[in-house]
């Protein structure tokens, strides 16, 4: 059996230094893996190790083999936005560290890593058990709101895949940090993603994703977490700070629980289209005024926005503290929860604390909404008579 552990700094088959173009080196290693693992029944994959250091990536990496782990020794995050807004003459360090890859993309491609296999997955099979762990992807230069920004993508998965993992990574100054299409049981955990246009996006369709224990910070123009046509994701234990935004489009049976959301914009959790049987529970929503701008939503959109049926919002803490002069549209009463459409949605034991009058709103198209200890009589604005209210005492 050929060696299955590769160090990008010592592998003898490289034709270029990894410090000059780590993308080219990793592509050469993947070619070596494929050349040495040719039996259908014996393809164990490999580990590609990136020791601590600063590496430039000029060439996009294309991952088209299963059971590949690309790992470093630390996520190495450093806030480049704070750096770029500061006088750094006396700073000890001004670059991200640990296993640090500068995504320069001089080959004309947007992605640092493209996970893609040619051929119909029903014929050639899915890509299985690919892991990215413990290194930093740095887009080098960017500015708020980071989208379209520098147009760079950290990791893009564009083939159907099973058990895809991203763990302990750092992402900074990218338009899109992670995009995963056609995912079955992906696990995205313990990452530090900040100063990117969007952090985590599940596109196409996915099932039983886990998005847990991540720091997702300053996704000003995009999404902290986005999923479409997803079945059964678990989104828990994340800290979403500044422009916190979880948006689900046509998703079912999602559990959004025990997350900390701090945002200076509305739409902290949005269920769009036809979203059903989702659970939003035991989260802390804190809405404040701060830097950054957004024209996507005004304060009538709701911190939680619901379109769909049989969704449950329960046991959440809503802390709203925005100067009246900063509320949009001017003079409006802000909405905490908006049930925009759907039948039999359930709001229970949610606590609202606000420095101004704030409302739970039911659109005229909604039916059979149940509201239990989630609004006082004075906090409910219903454009329908099809609801049940047990007011907060």
UniProtKB/Swiss-Prot annotation:
It catalyses: Produces alpha-D-fructofuranose beta-D-fructofuranose 1,2':2,1'-dianhydride (DFA I) by successively eliminating the diminishing (2->1)-beta-D-fructan (inulin) chain from the terminal D-fructosyl-D-fructosyl disaccharide. Keywords: Glycosyltransferase, Lyase, Transferase. Gene3D superfamilies: Single-stranded right-handed beta-helix, Pectin lyase-like. Coiled coil: none annotated. This is Inulin fructotransferase [DFA-I-forming]. One of its GO terms (molecular function) is glycosyltransferase activity. Its EC number is 4.2.2.17. It comes from the Bacteria. The lineage of its organism: Bacteria, Bacillati, Actinomycetota, Actinomycetes, Micrococcales.
């Amino acid at each position: 059996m050929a060696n299955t552990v590769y160090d990008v700094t010592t592998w003898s088959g490289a034709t270029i230094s990894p410090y000059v173009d780590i993308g080219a080196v990793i592509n050469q290693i993947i070619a070596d893996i494929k050349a040495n693992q040719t039996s259908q029944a014996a393809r164990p994959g490999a580990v590609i190790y990136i020791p601590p250091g600063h590496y430039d990536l000029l060439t996009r990496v294309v991952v088209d083999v299963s059971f590949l782990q690309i790992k470093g020794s630390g996520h190495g995050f450093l806030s480049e936005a704070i750096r770029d807004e500061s006088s750094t003459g006396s700073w000890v360090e001004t670059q991200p560290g640990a296993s640090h890859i500068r995504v320069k993309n001089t080959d004309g491609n947007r992605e640092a890593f493209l996970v893609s296999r040619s051929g119909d997955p029903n014929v050639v099979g899915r890509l299985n058990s690919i892991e990215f762990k413990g290194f930093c992807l740095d887009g080098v230069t960017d500015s708020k709101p980071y989208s379209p920004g520098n147009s760079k993508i950290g990791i893009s998965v564009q083939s159907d895949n099973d058990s895809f993992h991203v763990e302990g990574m750092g992402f900074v100054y990218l338009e899109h940090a992670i995009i995963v299409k056609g995912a079955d049981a992906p696990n995205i955990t313990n990452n530090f993603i900040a100063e990117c246009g969007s952090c985590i996006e599940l596109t196409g369709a996915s099932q039983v994703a886990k998005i847990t224990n991540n720091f997702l910070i300053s996704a000003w123009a995009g999404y902290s977490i986005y999923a479409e046509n997803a079945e059964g994701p678990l989104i828990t234990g994340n800290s979403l700070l500044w422009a916190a935004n979880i948006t689900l489009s046509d998703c079912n049976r999602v559990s959004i629980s025990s997350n900390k959301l701090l945002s200076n914009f509305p739409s902290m959790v949005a269920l769009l289209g036809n979203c059903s049987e989702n659970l939003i529970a035991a989260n802390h929503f804190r809405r404040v005024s701060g830097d950054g701008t957004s024209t996507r939503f005004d304060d009538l959109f709701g911190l939680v926005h619901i379109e769909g049926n049989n969704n449950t919002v329960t046991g959440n803490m809503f802390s709203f503290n925005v100067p009246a002069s900063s509320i949009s549209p001017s003079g409006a009463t802000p909405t905490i929860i908006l049930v925009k459409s759907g039948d039999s949605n359930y709001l229970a034991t949610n606590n609202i604390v606000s420095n101004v009058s704030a409302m739970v709103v039911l659109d005229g198209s909604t039916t059979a909404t149940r509201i239990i200890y989630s609004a006082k009589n004075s906090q409910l604005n219903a454009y329908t008579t099809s609801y049940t209210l047990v007011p907060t005492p």
